[in-house]
Regions:
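Conserved beta-strand scaffold positions in the cores of enzyme catalytic domains, especially
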Residues: 7, 38-40, 101-103, 211-214
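Phosphate-binding P-loop
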Residues: 1-5
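C-terminal alpha-helix
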Residues: 243-254
Length: 254
């Protein structure tokens, strides 16, 4: 590829609509750039992006990691270049190829606690795969862990999602401060989701980050979720699609 891919990472507190907005970004990119290669990465162990995009996942990134580790532990010594080649092949083999985009899920490690190993692997995968795509959308893990561990180090656009709550805005303020030190992003902005009344907007305080869009409560999206339908079933004028479009336009992606 001749130009740098645009890698859009979406982060924020859990439960604020991060995954839904990530899915809306993917849909918009497929509509505006139908001839581009687009990759959606579900980097959240809560594994919701597949449902939001209508994708059935059979194998995850963590499945690949564990399989390769097991082959090293159980078999003869193998050269690092051989393992890297196998990992690259397996990753592409594991991708779900839809008509308009490709999809890869991080998965959910079976053991409780730290996701350090799979996050370290994810960082390498993002670097490995991004050169093969025009646009990459990453639905990040809730909170700050993946930012803190430099998993998102090379993203070009960082989009922080919050609701109007003070807890939500505090989380994205913290993510932004850490990202300023650890992420080599080109543009960063925030989306405030589920704004039930415009009168709330002056009371929402976000430090040092441009607000890209305020998205009101979206009854059509809530109904879509309840019915288990994908973001592609939402009307074009639904609040979440309009808000996502506004945000990507301000970031000069659309």
């Amino acid at each position: 590829m001749n130009r740098e891919p645009k890698i859009i990472a979406v982060a924020g507190k859990g439960g604020v609509g991060k995954t839904s907005i990530s899915a809306a970004f993917v849909r918009l990119l497929t509509e505006v750039y139908p001839d581009s290669r687009i990759l959606a990465i579900d980097a959240d162990p809560a594994v919701g992006l597949s449902t939001a995009l209508g994708v059935e996942v059979k194998e995850t990134l963590d499945d690949i990691r564990k399989s390769i580790v097991a082959s090293v532990e159980d078999g003869a010594p193998r050269e690092a270049i051989e393992l890297l080649s196998e990992a690259r092949y397996r990753i592409f083999d594991t991708m779900v190829e839809k008509q308009k985009f490709s999809f890869l899920a991080i998965g959910r490690p079976e053991t409780a606690g730290c996701y350090c190993k799979v996050n370290a692997y994810l960082k390498e995968v993002i670097s490995l795969l991004s050169r093969d795509f025009d646009y990459v959308v990453i639905d990040g893990e809730a909170g700050i862990e993946q930012i803190n561990r430099r998993v998102m180090e090379k993203v070009t656009h960082l989009v922080l999602i919050t609701d109007p709550s003070r807890k939500g805005t505090q989380v994205i303020d913290t993510i932004k401060r850490v990202a300023d030190e650890l992420v080599m992003y080109q543009r960063c902005g925030a989306i405030v989701n589920r704004v039930m009344d415009e009168s709330m907007i002056p009371c929402i305080h976000i430090e040092g980050t441009e607000v890209l869009a305020y998205i009101p409560g979206d009854a059509s999206h809530a109904a879509n979720d309840i019915q288990g339908r994908s973001v592609f079933d939402l009307p074009d004028d639904s609040p979440i699609m309009q808000g996502a479009r506004t945000a990507l336009t301000k970031l000069a992606i659309l």
